[in-house]
Structure formats: C-alpha cells, structure tokens
C-alpha cells in the first residue's frame, strides 16, 4: 500500500488541497517527484489517482485541486479565474512543499498552465515535462473542434451552431449534441467497474470553467480565449514529451504544432484514445511516462 499524505495550502481567500502519494518503504526514493496539473479549469485531481502507480517506480506523486474546484472549491469571485491566479497557486504549492527538482505533467488546461510555467517562469526546478492532450493556442483549439464537429450528424451540427449564434447553451438539442461530441472525443460514460476515483462524485468548478474558458470545449470566450504560446515554444529547453490520442480533442494538428516548435520534443500518439489517454489505454500510458521519467531524472 502507498502512504498518502493530504494537506492544505492557504491561498488567497481560500485554501488549496493537495495529495501526495509516497513510494513504499524499501524502494529507491531518490527520484524526482512528479506534479500533476489537472484540466478544466475546474476538473479536480480525482482522475489522476489512476496514476498513483507512478509511485511504484520510487517517486512521489503530487496532485492538487486547483483553486475553484474539488476540495479547493471557491466561487462568487469571477475576477480570480485567470492564468495569473493559477500560476501563483502552482508556485505557492512548489514553495510550500519545498520542491527544488521535479517533473511536471499537465493534461488539457493543466498543460496550458505547464507551458506558461516552462516559458514565463523559466522552467525553474523542472527535470522534464509531459504535455498530455493539451494546447498552445486556444484559437487553434477552437478551430480544430469546429472542424471535427462537421463529422457529427447534420442535426447535431445545427443544434451547436444555433446555440453559438444565440448564446443559449441550455437548449435540449444542443446539450444532447454536446454530450455526443464529448463522448466521441473526451470520455464516455463511467461504467460501474471503472476505478473508484472516476466514479466518485466531484465538485467541479463550473464558474471557473465558464469564466476562464467558456460554455464548452469549442467556444473559448473567457479569460483564456487569447492564450497563445505557439510562437514562444522555442524558448522551452527542458525535455518535453507530448501525448495525444487519435480521437482526442487535442487533434494531431494541435499536438504537432507543439512538437514542431519545442526543441527536441518527443510525441506519442495513442491509437484509439480520446482526451484521457491515461484512462483509455492506462497500461501503455503508464509504461510510456514511467520510461520517460526514468530517462530524465
């Protein structure tokens, strides 16, 4: 069994929950820990518990609920939901835990935060980075989602177009179309035999998501709508592994845009996987990432 330590970091007017999975006694614990940055914004750390197995390799696994969701829930303060807030939180967590050397793994929005840390903060303390189903440009992401929407049935395309034109994202037809799109490219319904962390009820940060991103994955309208680090990716000088799935919201074009511009980057494209490659092909994901971490400790 793993040793799991939970704690809270005072942050702004709330507090940030974190969870540390430590290697079993008797294993080599000299390896750099890995910090996991969840998506959303507002999706919680829960799904990352399927990656507790990284501790089997002798390294601590650190995850946290970003302010605004999960055990760090906070709402009614829309002015907080900016890249700057979550960047300050990440740096505060690193200081609080006394980390000087670590790996980063960011999924979806978490990878956007990771890119900003690598570039704006000079990748301080980072041994390597895993960019999992993420993006360097919100506008490119939006264009790619709209390209994939064209493969939906005509009536679903129409429902989405009408919602975007009217701003009414509560229409039943739109909601059904959006659910279908997300099932195709993000994640399907959670089955009764899925890992407990995926079945567990979570407190999502709806206000954080809507304010920072928008009403859905393909309409970036919030504070992150102009997020674009594409032209600065060449400033990254730590080893980077890009992971995406063939059926992912992170399309091959989105992933290749990063791969082409980050010096000496590696890219693993997972066949048949959607936005959560670590769920759709858990065994391969863990094998690929653990090998990467060992090579870059």
Q: What are these language model-derived features?
A:
Residues 223, 230-273:
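Conserved loop-alpha-helix segment in the C-terminal half of the alpha/beta-hydrolase fold
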Residues 1-15:
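N-terminal cap/lid segment of alpha/beta-hydrolase-fold proteins
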